[in-house]
Amino acid sequence: MTNIRKTHPLLKIINSSFVDLPAPSSLSSWWNFGSLLGVCLGVQILTGLFLAMHYTSDTATAFNSVTHICRDVNYGWLLRYLHANGASMFFICLYLHVGRGLYYGSYTYSETWNVGILLLFAVMATAFMGYVLPWGQMSFWGATVITNLLSAIPYIGTDLVQWIWGGFSVDKATLTRFFAFHFLLPFIVTALVMVHLLFLHETGSNNPTGIPSDPDMIPFHPYYTIKDILGFLIMLTALSALVLFSPDLLGDPDNYIPANPLNTPPHIKPEWYFLFAYAILRSIPNKLGGVLALVMSILILAVVPILHLSKQRSMMFRPLSQCLFWLLVAVLFTLTWIGGQPVEHPYIIIGQTASVLYFLIILVLMPATSLMENYLLKW
């Protein structure tokens, strides 16, 4: 008798995606992050659902409702900090996942890569709107500063900002709609994840060598299921340690002050996972130029497949490209640090140098190095 998992209409979809899926035998732990992101998304949707049961999206009560969750709801503090720090884990996994794709040339699967970029934008939008909901000082001023950037769009900018705000400033209407979108977007993200996987399973996974692995495949279960479970345990241990020992480590103390439109915090900055883009935004003294650079800092990922000029897919056997890749990582760390610093000397010039280097490495140095490596390898 044929196994039910191979005949049942629903089970055979799950079977072909997670059980009998042929996977390359050489996948390293860098391939764990896709499944870790799935776990992060699940944790965020679950904790978010329970938080939404107690949260009120009204400017008068939003801050107090979060306080109520932490003080009066059973394990409300745990839900709140799991959700807040879960977002940080989500972005750590996201950036490592994208970094792995860049290093091993996974971007040559263009459909999967482009859906991944859409996913990145959707998750960033979700996180930004979620940060506004506690209605602390940094929530309010972060929302004001970031939404106000849209006013740099010629002709329609000012009207667009007022349309998003639902008035002439960030207020009750803004908070209500941000809550609505923050609730909705994770489900759109889930749908995009399914499309992402659909395209991935059309081509099969890449592997560290970048060489086609068709002759050497193994079933996903039990080999990679057990490997993924180890990843889950490590990540959930790290998240638990963060939540239970220092839940406010990655947050901003200003967000424990209720939002006050009459009092601007000395340093307005987003959560740590947006600081690199914020530093690029601030490094250009022109408003529209800064906004374009901000968008391009993420959208530049879309041109990476076009700029792949190497005859080899992966960087595994390309030491010069490896050096540039790790230089890019160092530049991103520098930008993250600069994004959290005040706009003064020497931070301004460091930020501008790092921003120029970021675009220079991706657009010029990496393609040029690829051509040089082709020449050195007589290709």
From Swiss-Prot:
Transmembrane regions: 33-53, 77-98, 113-133, 178-198, 226-246, 288-308, 320-340, 347-367
Gene Ontology cellular component annotations, sorted alphabetically: mitochondrial inner membrane; respiratory chain complex III
Keyword Transmembrane among UniProt keywords: yes
Molecular function terms from GO: metal ion binding; ubiquinol-cytochrome-c reductase activity
Assigned keywords, A-Z: Electron transport, Heme, Iron, Membrane, Metal-binding, Mitochondrion, Mitochondrion inner membrane, Respiratory chain, Transmembrane, Transmembrane helix, Transport, Ubiquinone
Residues reported in the UniProt entry to bind heme b b566: 97, 196
InterPro entries, sorted: Cyt_b/b6_C, Cyt_b/b6_C_sf, Cyt_b/b6_N, Cytb/b6-like_sf, Cytochrome_b, Cytochrome_b_C_euk/bac, Cytochrome_b_N_euk/bac, Di-haem_cyt_TM
Entry membrane topology: Multi-pass membrane protein
Binding site residues for heme b b562: 83, 182
Cofactor: heme b
UniProt xrefs under Gene3D superfamilies: Cytochrome Bc1 Complex, Chain C
Highest taxon above the source species: Eukaryota
Compartments where found: Mitochondrion inner membrane
Record text on cofactor binding: Binds 2 heme b groups non-covalently.
GO terms, biological process: mitochondrial electron transport, ubiquinol to cytochrome c
Transmembrane among keywords: yes
Binding positions for a ubiquinone per the UniProt entry: 201
Pfam families: Cytochrom_B_C (PF00032), Cytochrome_B (PF00033)
Subunit structure: The cytochrome bc1 complex contains 11 subunits: 3 respiratory subunits (MT-CYB, CYC1 and UQCRFS1), 2 core proteins (UQCRC1 and UQCRC2) and 6 low-molecular weight proteins (UQCRH/QCR6, UQCRB/QCR7, UQCRQ/QCR8, UQCR10/QCR9, UQCR11/QCR10 and a cleavage product of UQCRFS1). This cytochrome bc1 complex then forms a dimer.
UniProt cross-references to PANTHER family, sorted A to Z: CYTOCHROME B
Functional summary from the UniProt entry: Component of the ubiquinol-cytochrome c reductase complex (complex III or cytochrome b-c1 complex) that is part of the mitochondrial respiratory chain. The b-c1 complex mediates electron transfer from ubiquinol to cytochrome c. Contributes to the generation of a proton gradient across the mitochondrial membrane that is then used for ATP synthesis.
Family: Belongs to the cytochrome b family.
Misc: Heme 1 (or BL or b562) is low-potential and absorbs at about 562 nm, and heme 2 (or BH or b566) is high-potential and absorbs at about 566 nm.
Protein name (Swiss-Prot/TrEMBL): Cytochrome b
The organism of origin for this protein: Vampyressa bidens (Bidentate yellow-eared bat)
